[in-house]
């Protein structure tokens, strides 16, 4: 598997050297922010969003900016929701988590995450609607409205239920 991965990586690196550079730059920045135990969730999630923006906009065409915006918002969504869902384990394992300052105020954290994710999903919806997706629009809307939204709400409720046990 590693050989196949390496070959794919080398091919992508040759085909998209600027993308590879930008992705690596954002990965390095993310690593630095996490090592510094940065708790500014906007700065950290924006960095992961920038990384995902590069992944989503692989070619320069009329959809590049919209796809960058989709990737950026998906990246922010993933980073924030993952940090929220992992907080208990990160506290227990003494691992980095940007939400560590909320360890004693879960209700405030839940409200903050709910607000952040709601704004991100609103922007994501606008970005997706700006794309010409006639063929797969229904599938993409189902993923966005059912999958992504319900996953986020489930994690918020699940964390609350876990806390109340």
Segment roles from a protein language model:
Residues 1-48, 54-69, 76, 80-118, ...:
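Acidic catalytic motifs of isoprenoid enzymes
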């Amino acid at each position: 598997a590693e050989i196949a991965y390496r070959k794919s990586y080398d091919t992508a690196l040759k085909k998209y050297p600027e993308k590879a550079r930008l992705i690596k730059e954002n990965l390095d920045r993310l690593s630095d922010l996490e090592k510094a135990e940065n708790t500014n969730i906007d700065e950290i999630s924006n960095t992961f969003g920038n990384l995902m923006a590069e992944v989503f906009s692989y070619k320069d065409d009329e959809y590049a900016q919209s796809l960058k915006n989709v990737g950026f918002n998906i990246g922010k969504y993933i980073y924030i929701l993952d940090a929220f869902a992992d907080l208990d384990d990160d506290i227990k394992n003494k691992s980095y988590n940007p939400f560590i300052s909320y360890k004693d105020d879960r209700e405030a954290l839940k409200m903050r995450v709910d607000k952040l994710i709601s704004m991100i999903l609103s922007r994501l919806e606008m970005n997706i609607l700006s794309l010409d997706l006639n063929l797969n629009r229904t599938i993409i809307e189902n993923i966005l409205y059912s999958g992504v939204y319900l996953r986020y709400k489930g994690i918020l409720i699940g964390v609350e239920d876990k806390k109340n046990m």
